Amino acid sequence: MIKKIVSISVCFLLIFLCGCSQESKFGVQQFVERMNSQYGTDFATADFILGTDETKESYLFCEKDEMLISLSLDTNNTIRGVGLLLTESMDINDGLNTFLHICCVFTGESEENQRATLTNCQITAEKIKYADSNFVITVGKFKYSVICNNYSVTLFCDRT
């Protein structure tokens, strides 16, 4: 009887853990669905996703005419990296907030943990400026890259 109870408990625990875990690798459609559901935004419409060629290596989304979000894909059409390009007219804080959100969806981290990671990588409004600078930092399974000049700021997060 005890063996039966233990085995049933283990089954329920496995089902619960599998149901709560977030898939670590996913495609564009899943990324967009997560972005829209987690942040209540219309990151991209279903029509855009359905009308996009699935064999592309990257997808680009414009937001507010000043920000370009890119998703880089591997040969299996799973996302291997996310990027954000800001023009000089874009507020750095707004851009970093959007980068935080796309990194949360991409890495599966909570907003609090991802914000701490970006802060530890010095990807903050105090450090990121429209001036010549660049750096790359690897944290766990992800590499964060920042490229800045007088006209734009480019932020990347890739799987290592």
Predicted segments with their positions:
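Long, charged/polar, surface-exposed segments that mediate recognition or autoinhibition
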Residues: L73-A125
